[in-house]
A protein has these predicted regions:
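A short beta-loop-alpha structural element at the N-terminal edge
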Residues: 7-21, 32
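Helix-loop element at the rim of GNAT/NAT acetyltransferase active sites that forms part
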Residues: 21-40, 56
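Active-site rim helix/loop that mediates acceptor-substrate recognition in acyltransferases
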Residues: 38-64, 68-70, 80, 121, ...
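Conserved acyl-donor/pantetheine-binding loop and adjacent beta-alpha core of acyl/acetyltransferases
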Residues: 56, 72-150, 197-209, 221-222
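Short hydrophobic/aromatic beta-strand or adjacent loop that forms the aromatic wall/cage
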Residues: 62-64, 208-214
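Conserved GNAT acetyl-CoA-binding A-motif
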Residues: 136-139, 165-178
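Conserved acetyl-CoA-binding loop-helix of GNAT-fold acetyltransferases
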Residues: 145, 151-164, 187
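Conserved active-site alpha-helix within GNAT-family acetyltransferase domains
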Residues: 156, 168-170, 179-199
């Protein structure tokens, strides 16, 4: 059972830096090796990440969600959800133009290896296109919990938040899981569809990163 002292709510724009710092700390041994392959990010880069988060909340409808320990007021975990849907009201599916417009590669950071950076996003984008096609869906882009607050149920609460949104809309939910995270997602109804990998040794890295692509079926509307 989740810790009763934990609450989940939408992130406010002024909390973007707190979320960024949690993401940076949690991603340090994994995804940061791709995002910042050439070294620890500068404060300027971290400020840019913070501004991108703030802009996503304010202008792009991205659903950043936080988990707070009410006994201390500390933000201990966060998630980034998006609802990918047709622009036209009443449309059941997106156009292929809408699909491709949403599958972009953001600009790399100063500390990125541009080719490795693009390869990750192209890997994820091509598989979203293949697996989801033109269908609407919720996607969990990011889930991060501070390691010292693990096993309190924060991650599960943030996943459940998005699953409930997907159920309300009657659409599927999708994510790219690490092998370690996949069992928790499975408990929320996500099913493995495909396993993909990015071999960082192609760019003088040390690791091969594996991702399990998982899909949660749409809840039938009654």
């Amino acid at each position: 059972m989740p810790d009763p002292k934990l609450t989940v709510s939408l992130l406010k724009p002024e909390e973007a830096e707190q979320y960024m710092r949690i993401r940076h700390e949690v991603f340090r041994p994994t995804v940061n090796k791709i995002l910042y392959a050439r070294g620890e990010p500068s404060q300027e880069t971290l400020d840019k990440v913070t501004e991108d988060i703030r802009d996503g909340i304010t202008n792009k409808g991205i659903l950043y969600v936080k988990c707070v320990d009410t006994s201390t007021g500390e933000m201990i975990a966060g998630a980034r959800w998006r609802y990918v849907k047709p622009k036209e009201d009443g449309a059941k599916e997106r156009t292929w133009e809408e699909v491709d417009a949403g599958l972009t590669v953001p600009p790399p950071y100063e500390e990125s290896d541009p080719e490795m950076f693009a390869e990750l996003f192209n890997l994820f984008n091509s598989n979203k296109r293949e697996i989801l096609g033109r269908r609407p869906y919720y996607v969990l882009d990011t889930l991060v919990t501070l390691p010292q607050h693990g096993r309190r149920g924060a991650g599960s609460m943030l996943v459940r938040w998005g699953c409930e949104k997907a159920d309300e809309a009657g659409v599927e939910a999708f994510l790219e899981a690490s092998p370690m995270g996949a069992p928790m997602y499975a408990r929320h109804g996500f099913q493995p569809v495909k396993t993909v990998e990015l071999d960082l040794r192609r760019w003088s890295g040390e690791d091969k990163m594996e991702f399990i692509l998982m899909l949660r079926p749409a809840k039938q509307q009654t």
